[in-house]
């Protein structure tokens, strides 16, 4: 599989600890982000882990910081809200949550998250008196998924 990279993600290393983001495979949507420092995330706590990178997404895009599935499944580590706006120029930090019962050790150079560049729309905001009606209306929080799994609600758990 061959991909054409016509856009550029600009990156500046703030220290020698920084690792340039890279894809784990040629077809990967995300670029791996690595920790620039050793740290410990205590059980049931969160920490901001810095990459020592400045990142400028391509024009018309933002960078979404997303979890790495292996960290979630094996160590109960998840990534908090992470958006790199097109005009942000600070050190990229990754919010890591440790939902496990043991402290989690992060080493310098560990892959802690992935960066996905996504196109954005920046619409103007218009206040109106009402919105048009739809069949769905104000039904939310699972209303469209009821009975989707053979007539019963199903949840999958990994133990």
UniProtKB/Swiss-Prot annotation:
EC top class named in words: hydrolase
Enzymatic reactions: dUTP + H2O = dUMP + diphosphate + H(+)
Coiled-coil portions: none
InterPro entries, alphabetized: dUTPase, dUTPase-like, dUTPase-like_sf, dUTPase_trimeric
Cofactor needs: Mg(2+)
Alphabetized Gene3D superfamilies for the sequence: 2.70.40.10
Any single GO BP term: dUMP biosynthetic process
Enzyme Commission number, as recorded: 3.6.1.23
Molecular function per GO: dUTP diphosphatase activity; magnesium ion binding
Alphabetical keyword list: Hydrolase, Magnesium, Metal-binding, Nucleotide metabolism
Keyword Metal-binding: yes
Function in brief: This enzyme is involved in nucleotide metabolism: it produces dUMP, the immediate precursor of thymidine nucleotides and it decreases the intracellular concentration of dUTP so that uracil cannot be incorporated into DNA.
Record-stated family: Belongs to the dUTPase family.
Identification of the protein by name: Deoxyuridine 5'-triphosphate nucleotidohydrolase
Origin species: Orf virus (strain NZ2) (OV NZ-2)
């Amino acid at each position: 599989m061959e991909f054409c990279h016509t856009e550029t993600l600009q990156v500046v290393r703030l220290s020698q600890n920084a690792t340039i983001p890279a894809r784990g495979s040629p077809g990967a949507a995300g670029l791996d982000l690595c920790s620039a420092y050793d740290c410990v995330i205590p059980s049931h706590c969160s920490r901001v882990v810095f990459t020592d990178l400045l990142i400028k997404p391509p024009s018309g895009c933002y960078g979404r910081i997303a979890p790495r599935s292996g960290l979630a499944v094996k160590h109960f580590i998840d990534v908090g809200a992470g958006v790199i706006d097109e005009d942000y120029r600070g050190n990229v930090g990754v919010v890591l949550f440790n939902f496990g019962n043991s402290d989690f050790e992060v080493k310098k150079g560990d892959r802690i998250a992935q960066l996905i560049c996504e196109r954005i729309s920046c619409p103007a905001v218009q206040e109106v008196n009402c919105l048009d009606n739809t069949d769905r209306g104000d039904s939310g929080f699972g209303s469209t998924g009821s009975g989707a799994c053979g007539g019963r609600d199903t949840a999958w758990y990994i133990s």
